[in-house]
Amino acid sequence: HRYSSAASDVYKRQERILPHLQGLLEAQAIRVPTVNVSAMDLTVSLKRSATSEQINQALRDSAKELPPNVLGVSDELLASCDYNHDPRSAVVDSNQTRVAPNNLVKLLVWFDNEWAYANRMLDVAQLMSHQ
């Protein structure tokens, strides 16, 4: 099985939604040997130091504040195929969180590009139907 890099501007779209992160994100998407699942190698520059455990916990806490299935953090040792038909827009693999010198953090984020997107469109449709 092979994987290849994929063109993605997901992190740029995140900057539009979260403008205070502008200039702090850089990412590379990777197509993995499944039909729909991709992985994003996300690099973030922090203003202050933190451990990988603190970062993962902050992400878990943030996931609780967001609408359901937008963000997840997985502590399980999973493979790309395990994320097929996962409704979450992004799942951080906590086992791969790394902290480098100068407060540089690397995250591995999995997402089912088709299924999660379809789920968010359903969320929007439900929201609009209640207005």
At which residue positions do the language-model features occur?
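Single conserved hydrophobic/aromatic residue that forms the stacking wall/gate
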Residues: 1-7, 11
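Residue-level preference for beta-strand/loop junctions
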Residues: 3, 36-38
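Short Gly/Pro-enriched turn/cap motifs at secondary-structure boundaries
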Residues: 8, 32-34
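Glycine-rich phosphate/diphosphate-binding loop of Rossmann-like nucleotide-binding domains
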Residues: 14
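A structural supersecondary motif
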Residues: 19-29
